[in-house]
Amino acid sequence: MWQLLAAACWMLLLGSMYGYDKKGNNANPEANMNISQIISYWGYPYEEYDVTTKDGYILGIYRIPHGRGCPGRTAPKPAVYLQHGLIASASNWICNLPNNSLAFLLADSGYDVWLGNSRGNTWSRKHLKLSPKSPEYWAFSLDEMAKYDLPATINFIIEKTGQKRLYYVGHSQGTTIAFIAFSTNPELAKKIKIFFALAPVVTVKYTQSPMKKLTTLSRRVVKVLFGDKMFHPHTLFDQFIATKVCNRKLFRRICSNFLFTLSGFDPQNLNMSRLDVYLSHNPAGTSVQNMLHWAQAVNSGQLQAFDWGNSDQNMMHFHQLTPPLYNITKMEVPTAIWNGGQDIVADPKDVENLLPQIANLIYYKLIPHYNHVDFYLGEDAPQEIYQDLIILMEEYLQN
């Protein structure tokens, strides 16, 4: 894939010399903006905060306190927290046009919208003591995101808004860490009104994602290939490709194949003219250890804590020789689920096995033509998901 993009760069240079591909090559302005700038660009108010976890990680979170047509000084608006998926960031919820982005639609519907970022991504790469240049900083996975990131962020929102509970919307890994957190931390679970799970991932036994190829490699080989720190960060080269190459119609298919390598995509349900915006904010990075945790999940077919590789390390972390399984049947949070029939990450078979384990399932919808990214990028997402999601929130408020 990198060879294809390098070839695209040469073609771009040659094309510019001869005036080739002049049409359709203007970058969207949001491709060169950060999250706050995108929110402001579309006329919405925003606030930025740093949230510090108990283990010292500093997370960047963003708030859209109200919509464009809503006055700021009114009665408190119900808080909604949106949590992105694997190797992604809060930008996922705002990278489409306002009438197609969940964060903006919620704000315009009268909600106080909060956007989270998992440790190690572009907007959450700080620590009280550790340097991101050190392997120690990157010694985390799903376990720490569920144990530290979600409680810190949710408690911060509750304290800031003065509300006792909030709505939680997660996509992909954003659902995984929620299932873990809400099943192991009953006090945190009590603070959730409804858990909206988009493309939920608890087991990946049947996944067809290229991520599965990691399972064929030993940990030693993975660390030789990727190191022991950051996996798939957003680089200056990525930004160049996004804004100078992928904004051109000629290269959109190549770029989309690169961007959606792990998840797949349907060009018929994406606004391909915004591909430069998608690629300029993704991938946003995670830790190699987190990817090893996902490889472990593929191999085991179960949701369990990270296996540290030897019994001594496991004893130190878990007080037992093997990593414990997570029992999501203990989660009592009202849960609504949407999954896709073409999803190669949250495979329909895995979701089918998940449903009976959810103690309080209040809504379920299978969208036959959906793949993994349609839940936040799909052009028909407002009709397929967001309208019903907002109706469920309104019904909760009325009751």
Swiss-Prot record:
Tissues expressed in: Exclusively expressed in the epidermis within the granular keratinocytes.
Annotated glycosylation sites: N271, N327
Record keywords, A-Z: Disulfide bond, Glycoprotein, Hydrolase, Lipid degradation, Lipid metabolism, Secreted, Signal
InterPro entries cross-referenced by the UniProt entry: AB_hydrolase_1 (IPR000073), AB_hydrolase_fold (IPR029058), Lipase_euk (IPR025483)
Active site positions: S172, D343, H372
Main location group: secreted
Keyword Cell inner membrane part of the UniProt annotation: no
GO molecular function: lipoprotein lipase activity
Gene3D superfamilies noted in UniProt: alpha/beta hydrolase
Domain AB hydrolase-1: 78-378
Keyword Hydrolase among UniProt keywords: yes
Subcellular location: Secreted
A biological process from GO: lipid catabolic process
Cellular component, GO annotation: extracellular region; intracellular membrane-bounded organelle
Pfam family, one: Abhydrolase_1
Signal peptide per UniProt: 1-19
Record-listed E.C. numbers: 3.1.1.-
PANTHER family, A to Z: LYSOSOMAL ACID LIPASE-RELATED
Family: Belongs to the AB hydrolase superfamily. Lipase family.
Function: Plays a highly specific role in the last step of keratinocyte differentiation. May have an essential function in lipid metabolism of the most differentiated epidermal layers.
Protein name: Lipase member K
Annotated organism of origin: Homo sapiens (Human)
